[in-house]
C-alpha cells in the first residue's frame, strides 16, 4: 500500500514536469548555446554533439567507455524521463551521478561541454540532478563555465534555503568568488556539510583528482580561519570531517593533514579528541613525511592536552 501510494505521489508530482517538458521543446536550456540558438538545434544534432564529446573524453579516460551504452546510447535517445517510473529514474540518476563525478576533472574542456549539452537537453540534469551537478563542478566556482551552468540550474523549493545565495549570484551574473562562498559557508553549516560531503563522495567513488584535493584543503582550512573563534561546538562540527579525510588515500589524506594543522593552530583539543585524532593519523599513512610533519605540529600546538 505504501509503495503504491508513493508511486501515485511520484506520478502526480511529475504532471507539471511533463507540461514543462513539452514547453521546454520551445524554450531550450543550454550549456553551449544561447536560448535562441538552442531552440533551433534539434535533438539528433545535440545527440551527435554529445557523442562526439564522449568520444573525446574516452580518449582521455577509458572509464568513460561504459557510458557509450547507457547515457549516450541511441537506444535511450528518445527517452523522456518524466514519463519513467521512480525506479527507472533512480537508476538513471545513479548513472548520471557517476558520469558527473567522473567528468569533473575535465569540466573546463570542450569535450566535457559537448557531453554535458546532451545531458542537459535529454535528461534535464540542470533540473533533476541539480545537487549532483553542483557537487561535481563546485571546485570551479570562480570560472565562467561554472557561472554559465549556474544560469540554467533549476533549484527545487526545498533547496532554496541552502542554495538561494547562488540565485543572487546568477541574477547579477557575478562569478562566485572564494570570499562569497566562504562567507556563506560560515553563515550556514549545512552548506559546508554539502561541500565536504561532495568531496568525500567523489573520493569514495574513485573519482578524485588533484584539483579536488586542493579545493578541499583550501576551503576547509579557510573555513576554520574565518571563524571568529573556535569553540567546542565548532570542533564537534569540524573534527568528524577531518577524521573522515584521514581515512582516505593518497593526496586526499595529505589534504586532510593540512586541514588538521589549521585546526590545531586555532584551538586546543580535548584529551579525548586529540587521542582519536592521533590514532586516526597513525592508522593510515599515505605519505610518511607529511604524516610526521602533521604529528610534529600537533605536538607543538597541543602541548596542554598532552600533559
Where do the PLM segments sit?
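Extended alpha-solenoid scaffolds built from HEAT/ARM-like alpha-helical repeats
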Residues: 1-307
Amino acid at each position: 500500500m505504501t509503495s503504491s501510494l508513493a508511486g501515485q505521489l511520484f506520478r502526480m508530482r511529475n504532471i507539471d514536469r511533463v507540461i514543462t517538458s513539452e514547453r521546454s521543446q520551445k524554450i531550450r536550456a543550454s550549456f553551449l548555446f544561447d536560448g535562441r540558438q538552442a531552440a533551433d538545434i534539434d535533438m539528433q544534432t545535440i545527440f551527435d554533439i554529445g557523442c562526439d564529446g564522449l568520444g573525446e573524453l574516452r580518449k582521455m579516460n577509458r572509464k568513460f567507455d561504459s557510458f557509450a551504452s547507457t547515457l549516450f546510447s541511441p537506444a535511450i535517445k528518445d527517452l523522456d524521463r518524466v514519463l519513467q517510473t521512480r525506479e527507472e529514474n533512480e537508476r538513471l540518476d545513479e548513472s548520471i551521478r557517476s558520469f558527473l563525478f567522473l567528468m569533473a576533472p575535465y569540466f573546463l574542456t570542450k569535450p566535457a561541454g559537448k557531453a554535458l549539452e546532451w545531458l542537459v537537453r535529454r535528461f534535464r540534469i540542470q533540473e533533476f540532478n541539480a545537487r549532483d551537478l553542483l557537487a561535481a563542478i563546485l571546485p570551479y566556482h570562480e570560472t565562467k563555465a561554472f557561472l554559465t551552468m549556474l544560469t540554467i540550474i533549476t533549484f527545487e523549493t526545498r533547496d532554496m534555503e541552502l542554495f538561494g545565495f547562488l540565485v543572487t549570484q546568477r541574477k547579477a551574473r557575478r562569478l562566485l568568488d572564494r570570499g562569497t562562498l566562504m562567507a556563506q559557508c560560515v553563515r550556514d553549516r549545512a552548506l559546508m556539510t554539502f561541500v565536504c560531503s561532495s568531496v568525500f563522495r567523489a573520493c569514495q567513488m574513485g573519482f578524485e583528482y588533484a584539483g579536488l584535493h586542493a579545493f578541499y584543503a583550501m576551503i576547509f582550512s579557510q573555513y576554520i580561519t574565518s571563524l571568529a573563534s573556535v569553540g567546542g561546538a565548532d570542533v564537534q562540527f569540524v573534527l568528524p570531517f577531518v577524521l573522515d579525510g584521514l581515512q582516505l588515500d593518497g593526496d586526499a589524506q595529505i589534504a586532510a593533514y593540512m586541514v588538521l594543522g589549521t585546526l590545531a593552530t586555532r584551538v586546543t583539543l580535548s584529551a579525548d579528541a586529540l587521542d582519536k585524532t592521533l590514532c586516526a593519523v597513525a592508522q593510515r599513512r599515505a605519505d610518511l613525511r607529511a604524516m610526521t610533519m602533521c604529528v610534529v605540529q600537533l605536538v607543538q600546538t597541543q602541548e596542554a592536552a598532552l600533559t
